[in-house]
Amino acid sequence: MTNNDEHAKKIFLLRDHGRDATGEVVDWGLNSRLDNLQAAILLHKLKTYKSDIKRRRSIAKMYSKGLSDISAIQLPPSPEFDGINFDIYQNFELRAKSRDELRNFLNEKGIGTIIQWAGTPVHKFKKLGFRDIKLPFTEAYFKECLMLPMNMGINDDEIDYVISSIRDFYG
C-alpha cells in the first residue's frame, strides 16, 4: 500500500506488537487480526478505495457549492484550500448557527445528521480524568458542529435534497 520503505518498516512494526523480524519488541505496536469476513471486505475495499474517495470528494463539492453563500454556515476547507490538505471526507462536518434548530428541521424532513461526541468536547469528559479546563474556541465549535449525510450509498438527488432543505431553513 506504500512505496515508502520507512513507512513500510513502521507499519510492519505496528502490526505485530512493535516486534521486528527477529521477534524483538523495538517500538509500540498493536495486534489486530482480521477474521475471514473482515479480510474479504478489506480485499473489496482495496479495489474500490480510489473511486470511493473520488465519490466522497464529489459529494463534498456538491455540499460546498450548494451551501457556500449561506453566511450562517462555515464549511470545512477543501483539499485545494492549502495544497496539502488530503481530506477524503469520511465526514462532512460544518459549523452552523442555530445548529440544534437546523438539526431538528432536517430530522423532520427525514435527513439524519450527527453531532460529534454528542456535542461535548473531549476535554469535558470527566470520566476520562480530564481537569475542568476552559477551551473557549473548542467549546464554541462544539455548539455549532454538525455532520451532514456522507456515505457511499447517497445519490446526487438526495444530496440536492439536503442542500435545498438547509437553504429553506436559512431562508
Where are these regions (language model features)?
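PLP-dependent aminotransferase class I/II
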Residues: 3-171
